[in-house]
Amino acid sequence: MKCYFLILFVCLISCTNRNNENSPEKIAIQKVIVIQPLGNFESEQANKVLSEIRIVNPNVVLRGVIPFPGNSYYKPRNRYRADSIIKSLKNNIGKDSVIVGLSHSDISTTKNGIKDWGVMGLGYRPGKACVVSDFRLSVKNKNEQFYKLVLHELGHTAGLPHCKVKSCLMRDAEGGNPLNEEIGFCENCNKFLKSKGWQLK
């Protein structure tokens, strides 16, 4: 009889543990998002980004504008190295935060064997920092495109790769600007970000 109750008790504990694995408590709490304007980036536009991000994460703060890191300027092309910016930014936040740099100036990185490739944004997967620039965005719908770009790079820092769904915000730009064709995160990317604490529909 004692053996029977012992087996029953072990089974109950096992079932409870399996249920807890999928409980809401297991869902990650989203990190604090720090918005960092760079160079001559206007506070008005930075505040617009702040308001938009609060929709998906209320834990967001806006810092005052700072100069670009001195070692990030690439004189031959008169632009800033995104990888150098990220390296500098990630050293100025806590372990439970992720920082996004905002730029009007052109930014670049090394890609496909090209030493200095101009980009709209850069974020490592996963990572603590990313940077975006509106330099290459269309004049029409620039604010909307810029916000989509911010979400794209923050998606990378959360761990998302590029997505093959053409309407997904995680689509690879492939040297172009498909932002007007992107309407939101696809089902799979949405599910992943929700597991990271993002407040998406």
Model feature map: region roles:
Residues S43-L149, T157, P161:
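Metzincin-family zinc-dependent endopeptidase catalytic domain
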Residues T16-R18:
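Bacterial signal peptide processing site
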Residues M1-L8:
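Sec-dependent signal peptide recognition
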Residues N20-A28:
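Short boundary motifs at domain starts and secondary-structure transition points
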Residues L12-S14:
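C-terminal motif of bacterial Sec signal peptides marking the signal peptidase cleavage site
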Residues I29-F41:
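Fold-level signature of zinc-dependent metallopeptidase catalytic domains
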Residues G39, W117-Q145, P161-K201:
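Metalloprotease/metallohydrolase-associated module, dominated by Zn2+-dependent proteases
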